[in-house]
Amino acid sequence: LSLSGTAADCLSGWSSYEGHCYKPFNELKNWADAEKFCTEQHAGGHLVSFQSSEEADFVVKLAFQTFDHSIFWMGLSNVWNQCNWQWSNAAMLRYKAWAEESYCVYFKSTNNKWRSRSCRMMANFVCEF
């Protein structure tokens, strides 16, 4: 029996789409706390990730049934600052002095666009497994 998200496999209160289960939470948390919360809800749980515009549309409709705010955390971040950075002269980046501020991505449902902001910002969120 697969627990990958058919309608019968989703926990009570969760919604199924394309083999995954989703649940919006009307709780304000920073990105790290929201991600931690999602991992505690179900094995394999995380903040929502989008593989298509159809999936995003499904989640936005689901989210609006739970909260009025137009933004919510999704599982994309640059917490570890591990982008493939390279100097303009093609030298490898060996010395790093990143500011402590890291950026996480939230979904702005009024225009279905992604935006980055401090990971310390408080927002609602959607979990997925």
From Swiss-Prot:
Signal sequence, renumbered to the chain: 1-8
Pfam families, per the entry: Lectin_C
Disulfide cysteine pairs (residue numbers): 10-21, 38-127, 104-119
Organism: Trimeresurus stejnegeri (Chinese green tree viper)
Highest taxon of source: Eukaryota
Protein keywords: Blood coagulation cascade inhibiting toxin, Calcium, Disulfide bond, Hemostasis impairing toxin, Metal-binding, Secreted, Signal, Toxin
Known function: Anticoagulant protein which binds to the gamma-carboxyglutamic acid-domain regions of factors IX (F9) and factor X (F10) in the presence of calcium with a 1 to 1 stoichiometry.
Expressing tissues: Expressed by the venom gland.
Compartment(s): Secreted
Descriptive protein name: Snaclec coagulation factor IX/factor X-binding protein subunit B3
PANTHER family: MANNOSE, PHOSPHOLIPASE, LECTIN RECEPTOR RELATED
Similarity annotation: Belongs to the snaclec family.
SMART domains noted in UniProt: CLECT (SM00034)
Domain C-type lectin, chain residue ranges per copy: 17-128
Miscellaneous note of the record: Calcium is required for ligand binding.
GO cellular component, one term: extracellular region
Assembly behavior: Heterodimer of subunits A and B3; disulfide-linked.
Molecular function, one GO term: metal ion binding
